Amino acid sequence: MKEDFLHYLWKYKKVPLNTVLTTGERLQILSFGEYNSLSGPDFQSAQLLIGEQQWAGNVEMHLKSSHWYVHGHESDPAYRNVILHVVWEHDIEVFDANNQPIPTLELQGLISPELLERYNTTVTSHYQFIPCEKEYTTVPAITLLSWNERLLVERLEEKATAVNELWKAANFDWEKVLFCMLLKSFGGTVNGEAFLQLGKHLDFSIIRKERSHPLHLEALLLGQAGLLPEETELTYPRELLRNYYYLQQKYKLSAPVVKIHFTGLRPQGFPTIRLSQLAQLYELNEGLFSQILEVNDFKSIQKLFAVGVSEFWETHYTFTKTSKKVKKSISASLITLIWINVFIPLKYAYYQSLGKDVSESLIEELKTMTAESNSIITQYQQLGVSVATAFDTQVLLQQYKHYCQSKRCLDCAIGISILGRK
């Protein structure tokens, strides 16, 4: 058992309103108070009747009475106004700073066996994927509807926090933020962080100045990534190298120390190809940030990302080996991921900075997008969970990462719904 189960019992009023303390005194709960998620006692502003005396103050909870001393509450001023100590097992008398006994309520024996059985079955039992996997699909649709929207807003807020940190680091330049986020997406799982560091390290004003020179832009990105060959007999790589040396001198560039990987990637996802595509994206689109604020459907975004690679990369994946000529456009799946992981959180953070809440319109936007495909989503589908759009997948990913993995069932509407059944 975990302490959060005691919080659940108190918060959702699963404790008898009329009972007795460990001393045998009569206890009547007039108000359970408000849950406190910050430091200090677990519940504040509770109202109790102990014997004939009415009390108002805080309630603290532990699995055992002795944990009061384990946590050092006896010397903490924040706990001086505790009027009730709620425990699962009363194993020791507890005294306040004035050496007065603190009224204690032992819950063991007061909770219905059915509720305990549901708790043990759902939260503490062995499972393969998530704790509620056997009962997930039995949760009422109305519960899921409100919970899913809350999860999505949580996810938007979480991503907006990261965007805002990037915005501050970029001296409040939204174009630079977009550039960094696009680099991370183009880098994918393998090179995302390395590409992000490239973006952070590079002065975006150079991209603005050089975007009308395709060779310069590609040389800049490949050179900063450390991907240009030191020696080559091929004409195009030599041109890139020459242009990069020129840009190095012109802008006094220093390349960040990052490790770019090819291993484990399909050729279409090689960093050389991705950086060439990104260079072409910026060559063909001036003021890209203002454009992404306007697009909200896949067709428009696909048109924006209708770019390829420079001629050399049509017959190469690396600088050393020629390959069959293949059109290397940005795939629909990558465009969808960029829409979900770049455009949506960036729009949310941008409009939030202007004091506007666009969460509802972004939720509707996500509901028009194709569902993502990954191992976590597949496992939810195997439970019988319906996954139709990116809204569904984003909700499930947020739930899995922040609730299921850490077994926060008692903070989850699904877990509470299952536990609360009669």
Each language-model region and where it sits:
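Short loop/turn segments at secondary-structure transitions that flank enzyme active sites
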Residues: 65-67, 90-92, 111-113, 188, ...
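N-terminal ordered "arm"
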Residues: 8-66
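Hydrophobic, aromatic-lined core segments that form the binding pocket/scaffold
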Residues: 151-395, 408
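A broadly used, surface-exposed interaction patch
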Residues: 42, 46-93, 98
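Compact, glycine/acidic-enriched structural inserts
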Residues: 82, 86-144
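Cysteine-cluster motifs in flexible loop/terminal segments that predominantly coordinate metals
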Residues: 394-422
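Low-complexity, highly charged intrinsically disordered N-terminal segments
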Residues: 2-7
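Structured loops at beta-to-helix junctions and adjacent beta-edge loops in soluble globular domains
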Residues: 62, 87, 108-110, 185, ...
